[in-house]
């Protein structure tokens, strides 16, 4: 058996990247080999799940090359890994280097529970790369996307991944609001040195909702120096926002520049297949029985926000459990309230409103015309689409005649600047917003 396992390791070492081999393959051991079935012992449940999902085929193929006949592989968890069954937030950190703010990590937000689809594949790949090799390729990693699309899940998955490798990893996961509040409290208590040491001595800093740093000059100043200290020390920084750095109003140029140094990746709305997969995985983890037609019905009703999608599933399961009624589409339909999203404000409604207000046609808006009035109306429409829908920049460009996403980005930035300088633009935006929201309520 040892000869077989050594041969498999030799084959895989030549095929896999060093970080992948060191992280996943090397910690595993061969437990038993009988009747052409190799039992592999893994250090924790997360490793077992990951190996089963991603490397079982490669291990079996390598084993066949070693002994000249097909083999099967199966995975078990080490008996000494009971500690790994506990959520990371319950683990007792090593006294030599206690993690920072580990208690704020949600034990459910792991890579194994993240559903990958076309809408988030790039972000998932980037997050996994950062988790495997922090401080190397994508630093900082900037995740942007609408509310409830998985940014926080991916951020915290990175944290859990690092802690699974080394529980001594010092991690700070914090919202921008909390960072600002802690800064204010540190100033009040004359404890700035403690505050700075807390955030500048971590191995991994993850800061959520960075868009709320807008206009907070002193917070931006302090975060700028924290960013620099960590970056220059080779520590990983992960940032999440509902928009790209260029679209955060009143953000210092030097911060915007640093946020753009690494990789900016956008998470878009999930398609119907991904939404169904999310519900199926949720039902599986929560031991819920939900028929496929019910899954499809809920996934069709909730299209823009994963939190509301999962909330609808929980509400449906609770209802049939309490009422004793069967789990059918007819049973749950009345208790599924309409999603509280901006989905009722459609791209067509925005386009129609702008055309009516500025007296241009939809054909003109989708054309390549650079006439001043048409160009301004088009830019305004792009801005409103970004604000009132969850369309990505490329999707907004497609809605307006196939414009490039950089054109959309420029338009949104220009309107942002105009509304600051020009009260008339600000009043126009307010008027259009009021009409859109009023129409959506009827």
From Swiss-Prot:
What CDD domains does the database record attribute to this sequence? AAA, Bac_DnaA_C
| SUPFAM superfamilies, per database record | P-loop containing nucleoside triphosphate hydrolases (SSF52540), TrpR-like (SSF48295)
A cellular component term (GO) from this record?
cytoplasm
Q: What is its main location?
A: cytoplasm
Task: Cite the residue spans of the region called Domain II.
Answer: 69-103
Start and end residues of each stretch annotated as Domain I, interacts with DnaA modulators: 1-69
* Positions with a binding annotation for ATP: 148, 150-152
GO process terms (BP): DNA replication; DNA replication initiation; regulation of DNA replication
User: How does the annotation summarize its subunit structure?
Assistant: Oligomerizes as a right-handed, spiral filament on DNA at oriC.
UniProt free text on domains: Domain I is involved in oligomerization and binding regulators, domain II is flexibile and of varying length in different bacteria, domain III forms the AAA+ region, while domain IV binds dsDNA.
Q: Which HAMAP family match?
A: DnaA_bact
Q: What does this protein do?
A: Plays an essential role in the initiation and regulation of chromosomal replication. ATP-DnaA binds to the origin of replication (oriC) to initiate formation of the DNA replication initiation complex once per cell cycle. Binds the DnaA box (a 9 base pair repeat at the origin) and separates the double-stranded (ds)DNA. Forms a right-handed helical filament on oriC DNA; dsDNA binds to the exterior of the filament while single-stranded (ss)DNA is stabiized in the filament's interior.
Q: Which family does the UniProt entry place this protein in?
A: Belongs to the DnaA family.
Protein name in the entry: Chromosomal replication initiator protein DnaA
Question: Which organism does this sequence originate in?
Answer: Gloeobacter violaceus (strain ATCC 29082 / PCC 7421)
Q: What is the lineage of its organism?
A: Bacteria, Bacillati, Cyanobacteriota, Cyanophyceae, Gloeobacterales
- UniProt gene name: dnaA
């Amino acid at each position: 058996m040892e000869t077989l396992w050594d041969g498999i390791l030799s084959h895989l070492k030549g095929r896999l990247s060093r970080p992948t081999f060191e992280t996943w393959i090397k910690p595993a051991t061969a437990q038993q080999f009988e009747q052409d079935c190799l039992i592999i012992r893994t250090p924790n449940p997360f490793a077992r799940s990951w190996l089963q999902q991603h490397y079982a085929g490669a291990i079996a193929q390598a084993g066949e090359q070693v002994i000249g006949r097909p083999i099967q592989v199966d995975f078990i968890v080490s008996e000494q890994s009971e500690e790994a069954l506990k959520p990371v937030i319950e683990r007792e950190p090593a006294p030599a280097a206690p993690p920072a703010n580990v208690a704020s990590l949600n034990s459910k937000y792991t890579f194994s529970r993240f559903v990958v689809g076309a809408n988030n594949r790039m972000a998932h790949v980037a997050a996994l790369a950062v988790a495997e090799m922090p401080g190397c390729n994508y630093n900082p990693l900037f995740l942007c996307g609408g509310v409830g699309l998985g940014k926080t899940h991916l951020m915290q998955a990175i944290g859990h991944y690092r802690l699974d490798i080394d529980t001594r990893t010092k991690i700070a996961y914090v919202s921008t609001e909390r960072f600002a509040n802690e800064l204010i409290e540190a100033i009040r208590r004359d404890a700035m040195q403690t505050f700075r040491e807390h955030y500048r001595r971590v191995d991994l800093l993850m800061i959520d909702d960075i868009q709320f740093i807008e206009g907070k000059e002193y917070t931006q100043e302090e975060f700028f120096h924290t960013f620099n200290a960590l970056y220059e020390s080779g520590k990983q920084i992960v940032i999440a926002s509902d928009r790209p750095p260029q679209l955060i109003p009143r953000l210092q140029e030097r911060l915007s520049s640093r946020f753009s140094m690494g990789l900016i990746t956008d998470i878009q709305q999930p398609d119907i297949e991904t939404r169904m997969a999310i519900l199926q995985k949720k039902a599986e983890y929560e031991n819920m029985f939900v028929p496929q037609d019910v899954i499809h019905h809920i996934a069709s009703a909730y299209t823009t926000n994963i939190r509301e999608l999962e909330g609808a599933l929980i509400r449906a399961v609770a209802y049939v459990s309490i009422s004793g009624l069967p789990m059918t589409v007819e049973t749950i339909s009345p208790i599924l309230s309409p999603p509280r999203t901006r989905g009722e404000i459609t791209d067509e409604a925005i386009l129609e409103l702008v055309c009516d207000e500025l007296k241009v046609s939809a054909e003109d808006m989708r054309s390549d015309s650079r006439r001043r009035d048409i160009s301004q109306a088009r830019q305004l429409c792009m801005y409103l689409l970004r604000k009132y829908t969850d369309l990505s920049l490329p999707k907004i460009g497609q809605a307006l005649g196939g414009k490039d996403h950089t054109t959309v980005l420029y338009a949104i930035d220009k309107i942002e600047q105009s509304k600051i300088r020009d009260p008339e633009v600000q009043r126009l935006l307010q008027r259009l917003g009021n009409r859109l929201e009023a129409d959506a309520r009827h």
